[in-house]
Amino acid sequence: MNIGIVCYPTYGGSGVVATELGKSLAAKGHKIHFITYNRPIRLDLFSENIFYHEVRTPSYPLFEFTPYESALASTMVDVARFHKLDLFHVHYAIPHASVAYMAKQILRDYQLNVPVITTLHGTDITLVGRDKGYEPVVRFSINQSDGVTSVSHFLSDSTYQAFDIQKDIEVIPNFIDLSRFRRQNKQHFKQMIARNDEKLLIHTSNFRKVKRIPDVIKTFSLIRKDVNAKLLMVGDGPERKPAETLCRELGLCDDIMFLGSQNAVEEIYAVGDLFLIPSASESFGLSALEALACGVPVISSNAGGLVEVVQDGQNGFTSDVGDVEKMAKDSLSLLTNQTRWQQFSDHAAKYALNFSKELIVPLYEEYYRKILDASHITTTI
C-alpha cells in the first residue's frame, strides 16, 4: 500500500506513535509518505520505503497567522496525485481530520477517491476538542472520516460521550518496539548518576499542566524523606521553569536532574527503579508502557487510559489524581522491598509483550484493508 501519514512531528505521544507506525509499515514493504511541517523526531533512519514531504506555509503581510491548514491540504493533494496514495492516515483530529476531509474533496475533482482514517490520541478529544470553538469541526471531521481508530477504550468512550459520533471507532492500542524498549544492564551508567547507590525515579513528558509536574516533585519529596533517591526529569515544556522553581523552594536541587528532551529514553529507563506519571488525564500513557517494557514498575494516577496500561498491584500502583501521599507510600512499598520490586519488574516486562509492534501493527494493516474494501464498494455503487 501507498500510505500518506499526517502527524505532529514532535516528542508528543501522537507524533511518536505515528512515526513508529510508519517505520514499521515501511519495514513490511509499504510505501510511507510523511506529510508534516518538520521532519518527525523519531524519523531517524533511511529506508527506500519512507518519504518525507515538508509542508511549507507562505508568509504574507496580509496574514496575521500563516494558513497552515490550506498549505497542508494542498500538499496532501499533491502527494496523493503524484505518488498514487491508497489512503491517508491522519493522527490527532485537530486540524488534521478536517484538513484531510478538504483534501479528499479536492481530489474528487481529479477523479480520485483517497479514503481517510483518523486516529484519535487524547487531548484532541478530551481537552482541545471540547472547546466550543472547535467542537463542530471535530464532530464533523470525525463523522466524515472513512475510518476512525482510538488508542484506548477510555478515549473511544470519551469521544462518544463528548460528541455526536455516528462512526464505529476501532480501538487499536499503542505499541512499542521491544527490541529497543527492553531490560538492559546499564550499571555503569547508573553508577555515574547514583554514586551513593541512590534509587532512581524517572518522569518523562512534554511538561504541560495536564501532566501535573508539581505532583511528581511532591511525591519525590515525600519518598526522599525515607529513601536515598534521585529524580530524573526528562522532557521540556511550559511547566519546566515552575518545576525548577519548586525544586529550589523544597531544597531538592541536588537530588533532581532536569535532562531536557532526549531521544534515547530507553537508556534512561534502563537505570530506573520507578516511573512516575501522575497525570490529570492520559488517553493511554505511552511513556508508562515504555517504562514497563524496560522492567520499571509504574506509579501513576488512575486517570483515563492509564488503567489499561498500569495493572494496580501487579506492575505498578494507581492512585486518585493528586493523591501524592498514596503515590509516595506505594513507591516506598517497592523501593524498600527488593523481592517485591523484582516481582513487579518481572510482571511489567511480561505485560508489555501484549503491546509489541509485531502484534499491533498487523491490526492497522487489517483495518486499512477493511476501509479500502468498503471505499471501493462505495465508489463503484
Predicted regions and their residues:
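Short hydrophobic beta-strand element within catalytic cores of glycosyltransferases
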Residues: 297-300, 310
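Conserved donor-binding/catalytic core segment of Leloir-type glycosyltransferases
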Residues: 194-211, 217-220
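Aromatic "clamp/platform" in nucleotide-sugar-dependent glycosyltransferases that forms part
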Residues: 261, 280
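N-terminal strand-loop element at the rim of the active site
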Residues: 7-11, 23-68
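A short helix/loop element that forms part of the nucleotide-sugar donor recognition site in Leloir-type
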Residues: 182-195, 377
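Carbohydrate-associated surface elements
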Residues: 154, 175
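Conserved acidic donor-binding segment of nucleotide-sugar-dependent glycosyltransferases
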Residues: 312-313, 317-324, 333-338
